[in-house]
Curated annotation (Swiss-Prot):
GO terms for biological process: glycogen biosynthetic process. The gene is glgA. Pfam families: Glyco_trans_1_4, Glyco_transf_5. Pathway: Glycan biosynthesis; glycogen biosynthesis. One of its GO terms (cellular component) is cytosol. This is Glycogen synthase. NCBIfam families: glgA, PRK00654.1-2.
Length: 480
């Protein structure tokens, strides 16, 4: 089975969030099931580990300039395609924003070109490989199913479209329709029209043959008027083809026994080595040695991620002689609130603005618990990384967090199945109760260690999760 994986980012080449981890891990996991998945990625200027390539297709003009599809053969027998279009992707800054954090004004055209190339590959433009299925991710790839459905080519491969976060919708003005190579009659409710504008995510949801999102709970939430963010009605209409499939993680890449960024390696049989990592983290940030727990946050600092709940809980955390290390950036007001708290309480709170992959691993390996108080969370990977590294996740009861964590209530603790602490994010002080519970359990060493053990034993691998994708691909092919 041949599958084209269409994603605007994929680890290790380019990463801004969880989409990259998923898109980067799927091909290797699916290869174990004899699925030849090849990823198409824009050739951004900021690509890391750019592999050796050879051109396999040339465009004289693709959305305003010459472009080429490049092929790279990777270790492990995998193949990567890069869309090399310097006029669209050879720029300073990130994949979606300039060096000042502003969205590129032509993002719609940049990713329409990406989608056009994906559709061309799907229709057999490459000399020696044509996919049986196309798997497209998020709004940046939303026009792939649209271009294929609106084309006159036959046959065409079925398209699976995955929603990683419904909040990012790729909405652009109606007057860009022709510039995006969309026909006039596509601008309708049964097309790309979205409240008088063009919805690139909506296009993917409407035209794809099947839909997935990244957890069963989130699949239910986005069919409601509140969780659907303007697309709930469409998703209810498409409920028969909407599947909630949990994300996994690369258990080899995320392994505290071999992680090169971790000071002291450990596994579930040598948890005592985590104390070395905790002290290294405290030393790095000038925190006191303490008998209280060290909490960690690795997150975008936004309201969606519940960072305001963290700010509201800081006086309680400080009063309990607990500590907090934060890695992230985002909303300037929330970020400034955390920085101010760190300045006021430098021996208990530390904040690193931005993102640093090595530091994230050090926080996972040294923090006693990770705070993930999201208001909504499609799947979440942070809680999976936390469990893998022996940090107890404290999560809100939403989306994939609710699907992957077993709350440490009395019954679950007695049965030895608890993996974290869960709470309902329904009030401005709602994080205080789980923090209080976590601090109490932390001082009950036997229970806390069982939580760590159970989390580290949890199989969150793509090897396990990928079987659901293989079954869905097979079902899609059988319908053709």
């Amino acid at each position: 089975m041949r599958v084209l994986n269409v994603a605007s980012e994929a680890y290790p080449w380019i990463k801004t969030g969880g989409l990259a981890d998923v898109a980067g891990a799927l091909p290797a996991a699916l290869a174990e099931h004899d699925v030849d998945m090849r990823t198409l990625l824009p050739a951004y200027a900021g690509l890391r580990q750019r592999p050796e390539t050879r051109p396999v297709h040339h465009y004289a003009d693709l959305f305003g300039g010459a472009a080429s599809i490049l092929e790279a053969r990777l270790t492990g027998g995998l193949t990567l395609y890069l869309l090399d279009a310097p006029h669209l992707y050879d720029r300073p800054g990130g994949p979606y924003t300039d060096a000042n954090g502003r969205d590129w004004a032509d993002n719609a055209e940049r990713f329409a070109a990406f989608c056009r190339a994906a559709a061309d590959i799907a229709l057999g433009i490459l000399p020696d490989w044509t996919p049986d299925i196309v798997h497209a991710h998020d709004w940046q790839a939303g026009l792939v199913p649209a271009y294929l459905a609106l084309s006159e080519a036959s046959p065409r491969p079925p398209v699976l479209f995955t929603i990683h976060n419904l909040a990012f919708q790729g909405v652009v003005p109606r007057d860009r329709l022709a510039a995006l190579l969309l026909p006039p009659d596509s601008f309708s409710v049964d097309g790309v029209e979205y409240y008088g504008q063009i919805g690139l995510l909506k296009a993917g949801l409407h035209y794809a043959d099947a839909l997935t999102t990244v957890s069963p709970s989130y699949a239910r939430e986005i069919q409601t008027d509140t969780g659907g963010m303007g697309l709930g009605g469409l998703l209810r209409d498409r409920a028969a083809v909407l599947n909630g499939l949990l994300n996994g993680i690369d258990m080899t890449e995320w392994n505290p026994a071999h992680d090169p960024h971790v000071k002291a390696h450990f596994d579930r049989h040598s948890l005592e080595h985590r104390t070395i990592n905790r002290e290294a983290l405290r030393t790095r940030f000038g925190l006191d040695s303490s008998a209280g727990p060290l909490f960690g946050i690795v997150s975008r600092l936004t309201g969606q991620k519940g960072i305001d709940l963290v700010l509201n809980a800081l006086p309680f955390l400080i009063s309990q002689q607990a500590q907090l290390v934060v890695l992230g950036s985002g909303d300037k007001g929330l970020e400034q609130g955390l920085l101010q708290a760190a300045q006021t309480h430098p021996r208990q709170i530390a904040v690193f603005s931005g993102y640093d992959e090595a530091l994230s691993r050090q926080i996972f390996s040294g923090a006693d618990a990770m705070l993930i108080p999201s208001r909504f969370e499609p799947c979440g990977l942070t809680q999976l990384y936390a469990m893998r590294y022996g940090a107890v996740p404290i999560v809100s009861r939403v989306g994939g967090l609710a699907d992957t964590i077993i709350d440490a209530n009395t019954a679950a603790c007695e049965a030895g199945v608890a993996t974290g602490l869960m709470f309902q994010p329904d009030g401005e002080d709602s994080l205080i109760e789980p923090l209080s519970r976590a601090i109490r359990l932390f001082h009950q060493a036997e229970i806390w260690e069982r939580l760590q053990h159970r989390g580290m034993e949890t199989d969150s691998s793509w090897t396990l999760r990928s079987t659901a994708y293989v079954a869905l691909y097979t079902r899609l092919l059988s319908l053709r």
